[in-house]
Curated annotation (Swiss-Prot):
One Gene Ontology molecular-function label: phosphogluconate dehydrogenase (decarboxylating) activity
Active site (UniProt): 169, 176
Name of the protein in question: 6-phosphogluconate dehydrogenase, NAD(+)-dependent, decarboxylating
Family per similarity comment: Belongs to the 6-phosphogluconate dehydrogenase family.
Annotated HAMAP family: 6PGDH_archaea (MF_02047)
Keyword Acetylation among UniProt keywords: no
pH curve summary: Optimum pH is 10.5.
Effect of loss of the gene: Deletion mutants do not grow on glucose.
Record Pfam families: 6PGD (PF00393), NAD_binding_2 (PF03446)
Highest taxon in the source lineage: Archaea
Assembly and oligomerization: Homotetramer.
């Protein structure tokens, strides 16, 4: 299969590499000529514009967007749409709001798949978890690509109609917030409690057979190993928050109580005002799973 990939940042480059490794062809474009050259060195066919990328694809075009959510998606679609028809498929693999994905699907000349992507930079080796919404036929058509980009056939699923993939990913991120908050509070109690504990050792022990073992807990272990049990100079300012806000807003609209997700979001916003150990751990965990910049106390 031939796939066009637009957006060659951390996540987009992983898509390119995994699709190439699976034996498919990739045509790659990014606003950064350096990123395009690097993808070409890895085996992708370089394109110097969106129009050039489209010209290099066959009649039934399959195009994966991995650009920042918001205006960048709309701008890219504006460039693409004149070249597309109903036999083509476009995948938005970014963190778009599900309602925006529904709007784009209705306006796009091609079949439009909204694909929630989870796994962070670790997906380069392990593969991603992919939550896909949109036409069933388009999902089926892209299955070989999803198999390559995901952890395997069980690492992706068709969630339903347009918007459902990004909807499920939105809720996934809300759950992620709550899990980070729970781990943060637990380790804060251990750090401030009555025993002098090696928190790396605690996390390592929990990761081997405990009910609460998880990849996030493995990242806690990594954080304590690299920063120390007191987290060193890691600040308690936790960035992000948009997808958690969307989750809480949707819960209010659907009249579904989500107190844990709401409280974790409130703590994240509160991190811009005072200092707590739990938020410092959340700050460091965001580096672990997404390689987001770690705010330091002397920054």
């Amino acid at each position: 299969m031939q796939l066009g990939v637009i957006g060659l940042g951390r996540m987009g480059r992983i898509v390119v590499d995994r699709v190439l490794d699976a034996g498919h062809e990739v045509v790659a474009f990014d606003l950064s000529a350096e990123a395009v050259a690097a993808a070409a060195d890895a085996g992708a066919e370089p394109a110097d514009s969106v129009a050039d990328l489209v010209d290099r694809l066959g009649d039934d075009k399959r195009i994966w967007l991995m650009v920042p959510a918001g205006d960048a998606v709309d701008a890219t679609l504006d460039d693409l749409d004149p070249h597309l028809d109903g036999d083509d498929v476009v995948v938005d693999g970014g963190n778009s709001h599900f309602e925006e994905s529904v709007r784009r699907a209705e306006a796009c000349s091609a079949a439009y798949l909204d694909c929630g992507t989870s796994g962070g930079p670790a997906g380069a080796e392990l593969g991603f978890s992919l939550m896909v919404g949109g036409p069933q036929w388009a999902y089926d058509e892209l299955t070989p690509v999803f198999d390559a980009v995901a952890t395997g056939p069980d690492g992706h699923g068709h969630m339903g109609d347009s918007g459902s993939g990004h909807y499920v990913k939105m809720v996934h991120n809300g759950v992620e917030y709550a899990l980070m908050q729970a781990y943060g509070e637990g380790f804060e109690l251990l750090a401030e409690g009555r025993y002098d504990l090696d928190l790396e050792s605690v996390a390592k022990t929990w990761n081997n057979g405990a009910v609460i073992r998880s990849w996030l807990l493995e990242l806690c272990e990594e954080a304590f190993r690299e920063e120390g049990s007191d987290l060193g100079d890691v600040d308690d300012h936790v960035a992000g928050g948009s997808t958690g806000t969307w989750t809480v807003q949707e819960a209010l609209e659907q009249e579904v109580p989500v107190p844990l997700i709401y409280q974790s979001l409130a703590e994240r916003f509160g991190s811009r005002a005072d200092d707590r150990f739990s938020r410092r751990l959340a700050n460091r965990l965001r580096y672990g799973f997404g390689r987001h910049e770690v705010a330091r106390k002397d920054d």
